[in-house]
């Protein structure tokens, strides 16, 4: 099986966040790879990865970084493969990473999710892959239906909570 999604993180300290995307891709039966690459510490490896991704069959790249979060943009600057950026909460409550990822110059887009939003990055990657793939669209629909059922159940449980002035 050849991976179609790459999950890239600045270091393995990002794994607790990024494993949410990995678990979703596993659940959706999408082959993926994971690498630790740093725009600042391993720039040659980042360049080789980015320039070779399309040729290796990668369709979507999920890249995560904290602090001076240049990894996502550097990768996006060297490939035509869509890049989804995940800002990692570190210094400044992740705002530095968020702004570094979202404020890309014209022509070098990085789709950006919320701080530590690896699950949404995984979902977005699946949605990109599902264009023209009815089986994957069905899996996404089932996933979202399951989310709906969880909220309906939670709402029913909330109805049982009692307070003196709660009217429902």
Residue ranges and their predicted role:
Residues 2-41:
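Glycine-rich phosphate/diphosphate-binding loop of Rossmann-like nucleotide-binding domains
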Residues 3, 30-31, 80-81, 102-110:
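Glycine/charged-rich beta-loop-alpha catalytic/anionic-binding loops adjacent to active sites
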Residues 14-18, 42-46, 65-74, 93-95, ...:
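Short glycine/serine/threonine-rich phosphate/pyrophosphate-binding segments
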Residues 34-56:
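N-terminal beta-loop-helix "entrance" segment that forms/cooperates
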Residues 49-87:
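Glycine-rich phosphate-binding loop
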Residues 92-138:
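Short, glycine-/small-residue-rich phosphate/pyrophosphate-handling segment
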Residues 129-168:
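Glycine-rich phosphate/pyrophosphate-binding loop and the adjoining helix
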């Amino acid at each position: 099986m050849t991976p179609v999604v790459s999950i890239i993180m600045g270091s393995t300290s990002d794994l607790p966040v990024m494993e949410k995307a990995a678990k979703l891709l596993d659940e959706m039966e999408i082959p993926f790879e994971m690498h630790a690459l740093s725009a600042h510490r391993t720039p040659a490896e980042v360049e080789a990865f980015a320039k070779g991704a399309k040729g290796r069959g990668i369709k979507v790249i999920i890249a995560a970084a904290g602090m001076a979060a240049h990894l996502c943009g550097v990768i996006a600057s060297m490939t035509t493969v869509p890049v989804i950026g995940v800002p990692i909460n570190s210094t400044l409550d992740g705002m530095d990473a968020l702004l570094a990822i979202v404020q890309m110059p014209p022509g070098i887009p990085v789709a950006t999710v919320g701080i530590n939003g690896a699950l949404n990055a995984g979902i977005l990657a699946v949605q990109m892959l599902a264009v023209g793939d009815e089986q994957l669209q069905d899996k996404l629909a089932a996933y979202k239906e399951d989310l709906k059922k969880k909220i309906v159940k939670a709402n029913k449980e909330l109805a049982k909570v009692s307070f003196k002035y709660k009217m429902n």
